[in-house]
């Protein structure tokens, strides 16, 4: 287990009190060799990235050819994305479609989608005790209002590589006269 923290935040020991490695890195220059990992768990990564596309290209680079990435990002329509006192309230929230497009642009193929965290952002004990009930009810009654969107994607090694469009000259003929 390796915990990677953005360079601007500094190192954070994770998991706390358990063996693991922790390091800091720029989001678009991961300190790992190509094809290093089978799985990457990307939590609180995309919403605070300066360039989510560049970050995903780096994730693609360090994943093995059959590698998978699990992205957990704030849901654009969820309550948590609008509370600045939560980790989800800072940064860019995403809808499922936005994540699908972003992953496809990063040469990933989304395979599974899910949602979680219908519990409202509160510290009230009564509401906290009702969390399991609220999670079940939220999943059934208001599935679009979850706090986070979860997408599991596989590295798409056969995807077409995007190339820049070649500028073409257009010949315009004017009438003589």
Language-model segments: residues:
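Short, glycine-/aromatic-enriched active-site segment of Class I SAM-dependent methyltransferases
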Residues: 73-90
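Short alpha-helix
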Residues: 89-113, 117
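Class I SAM-dependent methyltransferase SAM/SAH-binding core
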Residues: 1-29
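A short acidic, Gly/Pro-enriched loop at the edge of an enzyme's catalytic core
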Residues: 28-40
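A short SAM/SAH-binding and catalytic strip from SAM-dependent methyltransferases
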Residues: 38-51
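C-terminal lobe and adjacent flexible extensions of AdoMet/dcAdoMet transferase-like proteins
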Residues: 136-141, 145-177
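Conserved catalytic loop of SAM-dependent methyltransferase domains
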Residues: 111-136, 144-146
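A short glycine-rich, Lys/Arg-flanked "PGG" loop and its adjoining helix->strand segment in the class I
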Residues: 53-68
């Amino acid at each position: 287990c390796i915990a990677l923290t953005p360079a601007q935040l500094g190192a954070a020991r994770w998991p706390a009190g358990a063996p693991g490695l922790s390091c800091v890195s720029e989001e678009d220059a991961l300190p790992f060799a190509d094809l290093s990992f089978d799985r990457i768990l990307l939590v609180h990564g995309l919403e605070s990235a300066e360039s989510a596309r560049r970050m995903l290209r780096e994730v693609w680079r360090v994943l093995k050819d059959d590698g998978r990435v699990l992205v957990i990002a704030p849901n654009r329509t969820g309550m948590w994305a609008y509370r600045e006192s939560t980790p989800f309230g800072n940064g860019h929230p995403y809808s499922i479609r936005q994540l699908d497009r972003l992953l496809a642009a990063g040469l990933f193929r989304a395979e599974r989608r899910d949602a979680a965290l219908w519990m409202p952002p509160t510290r009230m004990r009564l509401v906290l005790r009702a969390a399991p009930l609220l999670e079940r009810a939220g999943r059934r009654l208001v599935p679009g209002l979850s706090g986070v969107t979860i997408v599991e994607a596989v590295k798409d090694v056969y995807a077409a590589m995007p190339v820049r469009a070649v500028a073409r000259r257009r010949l315009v003929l004017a009438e003589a006269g």
